[in-house]
């Protein structure tokens, strides 16, 4: 199981606050760019919750109607990273990682391409030990064992579900452990 913040799905406009404040409301749509479109908001109190809930549930993001919200516990990360596994065309799955997460990965790859780490994953054996060590070094990971376990879980999620993309942005370091703070 990949560690994530405590969360609750809201599909009803009459729903009451599901957890103590503050928490984050996230539009549930099958597209990226939710934050830029106003589909991710912090709720500090009940008034903000009601305003943001109504606004986001009435939203359309990139031609996708919002039908649900994820209320998620606010988590303070010491660091934020980026991690994804993607399948493009007929090539092997590719892991993409960056020690700067929580941002637009396309912008980072344009402005500072040396920060992006890309490596192919053998679909039969997964990442090799030397690849994991290299990745941990490039991402400046302190707890390497936690990182190796986390990467293994992400690989299994990708391969076991037949996904074309698993993206974690940001991948947070919270209390010394890795946590998927947002994903698709």
Task: Annotate each PLM feature.
Residues 19-35, 62-78, 83, 154-158, ...:
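ATP-grasp fold ATP-binding core
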Residues 131-171:
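A long amphipathic alpha-helix within ATP-dependent nucleotide-binding catalytic cores
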Residues 172-184:
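Terminal amphipathic helices with adjacent charged low-complexity linkers/tails
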Residues 5-7, 25-52, 82, 104-108, ...:
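Glycine-rich phosphate-binding loop of ATP-grasp-fold ATP-dependent ligases
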Residues 62-120:
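Hydrophobic alpha-helical hairpins/lids featuring a short glycine-rich hinge
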Residues 1-21, 27:
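A conserved helix-loop-beta module that forms one wall/lid of the active-site cleft
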Residues 38, 94-143, 184:
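ATP-dependent carboxylate/phosphate-activation module, predominantly the ATP-grasp catalytic core
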Residues 51, 55-62, 135:
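Catalytic core of tubulin tyrosine ligase-like
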